[in-house]
């Protein structure tokens, strides 16, 4: 017995030693670079221009509804007036009536270009909430150190930030070695099927193959990573897919005084409950696992130990992360019942009821896998079909070992000293889904600091962006272009 206990004790000590060695020898994957000091931005003037853009109600509507044409055309004219050097130096094309494509030719046209993306459209303001806004949603008010209004954060901060950065570089006499492309969509919030899709098709027809693409997406997480005081630039290297499934239940209709054992509403409600109680399995892989790999070396030892030893602690880490919606969404295909229809009067039984359940699909899963899961979970008697035409598969994962990702890390370190950077899985969708065939290196990042409370404002009430943070975003875009497209001065005339 004593011998057995001794062997067990030695085994435990060896295990602890292995765990501690793995945790204590993790190498940092951060990039350290000298801070940039020669990119002065007039924060107040830049904020005024962003505020002006917010005042245009460029609301995108579902397919089949009219575009807010005048608002987009007015915004186009505003951008032209606000950034005169951009519009004198770059070529601008209007795509699909309202999207914009800019080209800044490089003096080495044989180099693959870079593509910076964002979108000009915004989601509607929820009817009835207008009075809950501190400042009217399309006022573009500047107050308390913030620019307020719908689209300030999603995503006019990127559209204007990119243009401000390019305007700054032109003013400094910068000439890109490689071509710089800017693509601003007009219907991202409803899938990008007209604007972004048309722009991607146009670039493909021209044989354009960008070295890398950057769109909106991950943010600078401020106070949102447990164990880390430093803000973290969450650079999304992949995004989830999307599908909404329509569930249909049928039963006998008639008067509520003589109901069947199960009404159509009861059947569809039970189906939704089964889906909520039986989510698709969690996995720690892909971009989420890489995020842990980048952040674990920066954590205190106690927090680092389980992440450095997922071979042992993965089940426990999954249980811990599944307790919070945000972290749970990084590990699994999520299930969200969003709409239900089944009644017209309190004493009338309809013969049919429907529910719509939205799934954000984890890379490694698929639309087909979601449908199979739904059918097996809700059981027979419930109709299952894909709703609408916005279904999309998860994106491929862009590699963090590529020079393009390191370029983003370097720019973060130069513009935001002391900030960490890590890959990330984006739970939402972006216009990049239409551009995936153009480049294997696709990233999603907005260089603006955000707290957990700020996230609720995006698509919600009191959307805003800090004047100071916006100036930082302008510097980031300018430095990113310098890093990616800079080089020796172009040769002079012979």
Q: Model-predicted segments: where are they?
A:
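Acidic/His- and Gly-rich active-site-bordering loop/insert found
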Residues: 12-150, 171-176
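Acidic/histidine-rich catalytic neighborhood of metal-dependent amide-processing enzymes
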Residues: 146-147, 151-234
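Metal-dependent amide/peptide-bond hydrolase catalytic core
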Residues: 4-43, 48, 90, 218-238, ...
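Conserved hydrophobic/aromatic beta-strand scaffold that supports enzyme active sites
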Residues: 101-103, 213, 246
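Loop/turn elements at helix/coil->beta-strand transitions in domains of secreted/extracellular proteins
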Residues: 110-113, 176-180, 208-211, 417-419, ...
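Solvent-exposed loop/turn segments at secondary-structure junctions
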Residues: 60-61, 109, 120-123, 187-191, ...
């Amino acid at each position: 017995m004593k011998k057995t206990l001794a062997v067990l004790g030695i085994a435990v000590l060896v295990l602890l030693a292995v765990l501690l060695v793995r945790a204590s020898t993790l190498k940092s994957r951060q990039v350290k670079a000298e801070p940039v000091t020669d990119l002065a931005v007039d924060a107040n003037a830049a904020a005024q221009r962003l505020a002006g853009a917010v005042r245009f109600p460029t609301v995108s509507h579902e397919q089949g509804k009219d575009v807010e044409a005048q608002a987009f055309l007015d915004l186009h004219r505003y951008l032209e007036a606000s950034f005169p050097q951009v519009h004198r130096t770059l070529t601008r094309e209007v795509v699909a009536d309202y999207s914009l494509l800019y080209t800044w030719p490089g003096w080495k046209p044989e180099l693959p270009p870079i593509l910076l993306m964002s979108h000009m459209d915004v989601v509607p303001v929820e009817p009835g909430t207008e009075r809950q806004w501190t400042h009217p949603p399309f006022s573009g008010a500047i107050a308390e150190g913030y620019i307020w209004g719908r689209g300030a954060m999603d995503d006019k901060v990127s559209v204007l930030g990119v243009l401000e950065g390019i305007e700054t570089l032109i003013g400094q006499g910068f000439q890109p070695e490689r071509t710089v492309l800017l693509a601003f969509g007009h219907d991202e919030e409803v899938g990008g099927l007209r604007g972004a899709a048309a722009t991607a098709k146009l670039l493909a027809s021209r044989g354009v193959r960008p070295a890398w693409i950057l769109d909106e997406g991950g943010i600078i997480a401020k106070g949102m990573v447990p164990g880390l005081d430093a803000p973290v630039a969450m650079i999304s290297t992949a995004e989830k897919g999307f599908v909404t499934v329509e569930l249909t239940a049928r039963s006998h209709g008639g008067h509520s005084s003589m109901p069947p054992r199960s009404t159509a509403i009861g059947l569809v409600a039970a189906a939704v409950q089964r889906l909520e109680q039986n989510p698709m399995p969690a996995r720690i892989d892909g971009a989420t696992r890489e995020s842990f790999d980048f952040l674990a070396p920066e954590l205190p030892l106690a927090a680092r130990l389980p992440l450095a030893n997922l071979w042992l602690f993965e089940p426990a880490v999954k249980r811990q992360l599944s307790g919070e919606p945000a972290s749970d969404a990084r590990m699994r295909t999520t299930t969200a019942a969003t709409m239900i229809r089944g009644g017209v009067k309190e004493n009338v039984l309809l013969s049919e009821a429907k529910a719509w359940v939205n799934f954000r699909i984890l890379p490694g899963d698929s639309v087909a896998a979601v449908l199979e899961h739904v059918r097996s979970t809700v059981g027979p008697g419930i109709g299952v079909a894909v709703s609408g035409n916005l279904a999309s598969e998860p994106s491929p994962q862009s590699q963090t070992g590529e020079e393009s990702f390191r370029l983003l890390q370097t720019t973060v370190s130069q513009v935001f000293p002391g900030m960490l950077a890590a890959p990330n899985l984006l739970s939402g969708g972006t216009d990049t889904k239409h551009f995936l065939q153009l480049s294997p290196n696709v990233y999603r990042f907005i260089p603006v600091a955000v707290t957990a409370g700020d996230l609720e404002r995006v698509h919600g009430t009191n959307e805003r962006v800090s004047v100071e943070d916006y100036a930082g975003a302008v510097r980031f875009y300018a430095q990113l272009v310098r890093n990616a497209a800079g080089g020796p001065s172009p040769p002079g005339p012979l």
